[in-house]
Amino acid sequence: MEKIELLAPAGNLRILKAAVDSGADAVYCGLTVFNARINAENLTLGQFEEGVDYAHARSSRVYLTVNTLVSDMERDDLFDTVSKACEAGADGLIVQDIAVLKMLREAFPDVRINASTQMNIYSRDQFKELFKLGVNRVVLPRELSMDEISSRVHLAARYGIDCEVFAHGAVCVCASGLCLFSAMNKAGTRSGNRGTCAQPCREEYKLYNGGLRLRAGHLLSPKDRDVSDYLARLIETGVASLKLEGRMRDENYVRSAVRAYRTLIDAYYDGYLDDTLLNEIKRDLLINFNRGGSYTAQYLSGRKDDNILSGEYPGKYGYSLGKISRMDVKKGTVTISLGKHPVIPSKGDYLSIRNDKNELCSFPVGKLHEMPHEIAVKGLHPDAIQKLKPGLSVFIMNHATEQDRAELRRTPVRFNLYFNDTDVTLDATVISGPNADITAAATLEIPSDYEGAPLDEERIRTQLSKTLDTAFYPDEINIYGETKSCPISLINGLRREVLSSIEKEITTSYKRTARPLSDDVSDAGLTTADKTKLTMFTYPVIRQNMDIISEGADIYCYSIYDMAVKELRDHVIAFAEKTDTKIAVFLPDFSHDLLEKIIDKVLASLKSDAGERFYAVISSRLLSDKAFIKGLGVKDFISAGANIYSSKSAEIALGYCDGLFMSHEVDADELVNNALDVFPADKTLIVQSEGMIPWMQSDFCVCGQNKKHCDTCSKVGVFELQQKDRMGASVLAVPHSIDCSCTLYGPAKNLVTEDLISTLSYGNFSLIINHTYLPEVKDGETVY
């Protein structure tokens, strides 16, 4: 049985090698451009090739992250960069942008293409189109339950696509690929979709209902994820790869996380994975890094986790060691009474001493003395010791790990040694793994004047086994022919030469060259052909006040959450009939399978009741099966959540839909140029002219905190979320009762002005000008 892949992060070359050594089957890393962790150290092209060769020699793979949105101007630079990485031997490319995906699939037909979680492949009906695009793997959203993962794994397998699941590490409170919080907030220069997320979710906020403050603190900061309790089920489901997050974290973190999951995976396949081992590994992981003192499995159970937030300590929390029992200022010692499951720190490990609210001090352990149920440690300055008192909590913040050289990951080979009359030949063959059956051989003559005794076979085996400083280990040694009298240095020389040759054979086998790209020409252009210019008013929430709908538009767009309520649905249909206007419905850019069934029923009911006034469905489901939408006889428009960022991605996307929003991150002038370049006459461009836009779409409800039966959103339609320092814009939080999710709305920075709309009128396409209206919260009351 082929084992599930363990995929590790690497923020630099040193960590890449550490991850491989520790047992990672594959490593993902980025270069200094075009990746979603651009603030990591990352690798130069030279370092990348060195890392790829190092990994391949040890039967590990390397995936290059190209998981950002890419502009038209950057396209050539990206292609040159990826070409050099593939020439260096990259095994696969992790991609977000659909235009990048198509370009790289064409240029590198033999390189794996992995659809990043940033592509937000959440619905079950997208795998057919992904297969047509040449995708080999989908990185599934972190928000899925075990049942949802299982159904997607089996559907993907029909098309030869495998699935990857995040196993451990930091998580975003927003569904992947849908967060504009960093890109739009404050200066608005740090985009998560462009690799420079400022992590505003880790900051402090206040939540208001009108002028009434409901709660304050780190309201958007989730704990780290850990799926160790679900490991067996994930393997049995058929998941191909378990991914560890952490390209911004240090070598010790990566080494520890890889070793922990390597132990668990091997234990499962060897039949000894049990609760005792799981608890031991969890403790090691908690020491390595956690937020809030524990982990979350998010939604794997199928239920909302109401303990998902990190609490008021959003950084590295540590592992509880015990409490201070006494101090000795003269000796410079702090004595700690150990807790139930203690870990004895080593010299150099950091300890943190805290009261109920804050860290008081931290220090590296110097000397340590163990006693029954206690330890006395040195390392803290006497002046700092004087400020402490018994009863304060002590946490261990890290625990340095060492690894025996014999335990490092290596490639198994079979040695065959042949003694002939005048020479000795050694060949080596890789026994298993991705490099199986690669062979190398070398022959050296026996010195004619050598007069030593014939070599002992055991001595020969010992010398051939001296491979600790290489990427290989001999799993099998065969000796043929009568052993001859020859210097032991000859055997050592053969071993070195053969292993050097086989390593070169392995690394060379991965080098590739790019195919030339085709030069697609768009048929868009300026025209005076018939086209439409319509105005659309979008109302993300009307359930608390249906009177907010005002006349003046051609199309009125409402949330599927509101349209699921018959009273609201009847009201908007009556308004459309009264004003002779049309109705559009926008769907969430992420949803669970249960909501999918509700969506279909609601859309069918709306079509039945509204008839031809039901004009369009707006969603991010670019690659989904469109049969149901077509059957309704309505327009299929794509939302900004699909992240259509360039003219190339727009050109591709228009092949799947009737019209679209470009990404809200696209500069308004650039948006106009892109549209004039590629939009044909039978398509529609939708532009944002006024109002707020979705900054974050989350399966976690910041209003109700995922509490069961909270009933928060039945009373209030919108809440205000404000940063503690008031430096950022006020954000409106709209909770959704059907699935207990939440959308945060904030100001748009790339609104399309009247002048630009006039320029767009020269295009060959229809135009919809959108205005979004949300409640304005003032002075303790909600004003519409």
Task: Tell me what each language-model feature is.
Residues 119-123:
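Conserved phosphate-binding/catalytic loop of the ribokinase/pfkB sugar-kinase fold
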Residues 40:
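A short acidic, glycine-rich active-site loop
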